[in-house]
Swiss-Prot record:
Major subcellular location class: membrane
Keyword hit for Nucleus: no
UniProt keywords, alphabetically: Coiled coil, Endosome, Lipoprotein, Membrane, Myristate, Phosphoprotein, Protein transport, Transport, Ubl conjugation
Residues passing through the membrane, by range: none
Post-translational modification remark: ISGylated in a CHMP5-dependent manner. Isgylation weakens its interaction with VPS4A.
Protein name, UniProt field: Charged multivesicular body protein 6
A single BP term in Gene Ontology: negative regulation of epidermal growth factor-activated receptor activity
Coiled-coil annotated residue ranges, if any: 10-145
Signal peptide: none
Free-text comment about domains: The acidic C-terminus and the basic N-termminus are thought to render the protein in a closed, soluble and inactive conformation through an autoinhibitory intramolecular interaction. The open and active conformation, which enables membrane binding and oligomerization, is achieved by interaction with other cellular binding partners, probably including other ESCRT components.
GO cellular component: amphisome membrane; autophagosome membrane; cytosol; endosome membrane; ESCRT III complex; extracellular exosome; kinetochore; kinetochore microtubule
Length: 201
């Protein structure tokens, strides 16, 4: 049990993943380099101003040449970063294409297996059997319809009408009055009087 739950999952990092990680690390290093150079250029520009104020024009000019060279380095660095990002995007898109192709291949294999189970011949056989069953039932219906005379048809319709009439007829309401029930709590002496009233009515 311990080995079962303690087993480490196998790494699913591919060579493409490693390449993407390495390219992104190089890109990040170049961006850090850009940031340092940009900060240095600001300092050198401020220093060149100070040198001009101090009357040291040649020194300021030399510093500006150095600054210009570093700006060119920044442009080259930006181009390198763009190339790295394009490479990363290309690899990532290729990975997506590979997954799509794997999905298409899996789907194609499933379709092939289904076609093996249900071939065209099998489908045609089932359709033929279905058509035969329908035709057989039609022939039975025709035989049954032709075996009855007009007298039989009339008798069947008459019986059907009688059954229908039985279902819709309701029982009649009784015309005789219901016998009057003498309440149990009426005194015994009063009961003959009630019987006389009923007879008189």
């Amino acid at each position: 049990m311990g080995n079962l739950f303690g087993r480490k999952k196998q790494s699913r990092v591919t060579e493409q993943d490693k390449a993407i990680l390495q390219l992104k690390q190089q890109r990040d290093k170049l961006r850090q380099y850009q940031k340092r150079i940009a900060q240095q250029l600001e300092r050198e520009r401020a220093l060149a101003r100070q040198l001009l104020r101090d009357g040291r024009k040649e020194r300021a000019k030399l510093l500006l040449k150095k600054k210009r060279y570093q700006e060119q380095l920044l442009d080259r660095t930006e181009n390198q970063i763009s190339s790295l990002e394009a490479m990363v995007q290309s690899i990532e898109f290729t990975q997506i294409e590979m997954k799509v192709m794997e999905g298409l291949q899996f789907g194609n294999e499933c379709l092939n297996k289904m076609h093996q189970v249900m071939s065209i011949e099998e489908v045609e056989r089932i359709l033929d059997e279905t058509q035969e069953a329908v035709e057989y039932q039609r022939q039975i219906d025709e035989l049954l319809a032709g075996s009855f005379t007009q007298e039989d048809e009339d008798a069947i319709l008459e019986e059907l009408s009688a059954i229908t009439q039985e279902q819709i007829e309701l029982p009649e309401v009784p015309s005789e009055p219901l016998p009057e029930k003498i309440p149990e709590n009426v005194p015994v002496k009063a009961r003959p009087r009630q019987a006389e009233l009923v007879a008189a009515s």
